[in-house]
């Protein structure tokens, strides 16, 4: 049986859906525990204080607070800092 298809057929024409990676919460934004901060492949950003890392390297907040980006030992890190409540 021939392995060539008939005329006017193509094996192309498919494309994969985008993975929607990137920073989801930016510096200074207030987040709740469990919110996703960064979707990534590999550790482009490393988890810092109050930040966890999922099995697919996603960074998420482990407590409520404000997002803070920084550098520690030459690595980009993401931290969650407590937001001070002001009494008016």
Swiss-Prot record:
One GO term describing the cellular component: cytosolic large ribosomal subunit
Pfam families cross-referenced by the UniProt entry: Ribosomal_L27
PROSITE patterns: RIBOSOMAL_L27
SUPFAM superfamilies recorded: Ribosomal L27 protein-like
GO molecular function: structural constituent of ribosome
Keyword Ribonucleoprotein tagged: yes
Keywords annotated in UniProt: Ribonucleoprotein, Ribosomal protein
BP term (GO), one: translation
Entry superkingdom: Bacteria
HAMAP family for the chain: Ribosomal_bL27
Cited NCBIfam families: L27 (TIGR00062)
Family from the record: Belongs to the bacterial ribosomal protein bL27 family.
Protein's UniProt name: Large ribosomal subunit protein bL27
Native species: Mycobacterium leprae (strain TN)
Taxonomic lineage: Bacteria, Bacillati, Actinomycetota, Actinomycetes, Mycobacteriales
Gene it is expressed from: rpmA
């Amino acid at each position: 049986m021939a392995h060539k298809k008939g005329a006017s057929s193509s094996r192309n024409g498919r494309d994969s859906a985008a993975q929607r990676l990137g920073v989801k919460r930016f510096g200074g934004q207030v987040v709740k525990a469990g919110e996703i901060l960064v979707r990534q492949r590999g550790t482009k950003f490393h988890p810092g204080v109050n930040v966890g890392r999922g099995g697919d390297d996603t960074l998420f907040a482990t407590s409520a607070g404000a997002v803070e980006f920084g550098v520690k030992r030459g690595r980009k890190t993401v931290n969650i800092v407590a937001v001070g409540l002001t009494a008016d």
